[in-house]
């Protein structure tokens, strides 16, 4: 299933206001059912310079791509990583799978 990226500030704002939230030690997820699968990533400046922030975004996109087939419905999702020493695709995948099971997505 193809997913589309959330790009507009209005889309992010709508999700932040009306979406449900789920948390893990390394990740916060805000989601809401929608007609098509959309995903956005919000990485703050506390994560370092742009090189580190862009790397985290690449890792999150890859982790989401790997687990999106396990989702039952289509959602609009924002992924927000927490500040940590270690970021890896496997860690993000594990955390996303846990959220999908817990929230019955």
Positions of predicted regions on the chain:
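Positively charged, solvent-exposed patches that mediate nucleic-acid binding
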Residues: 1-105
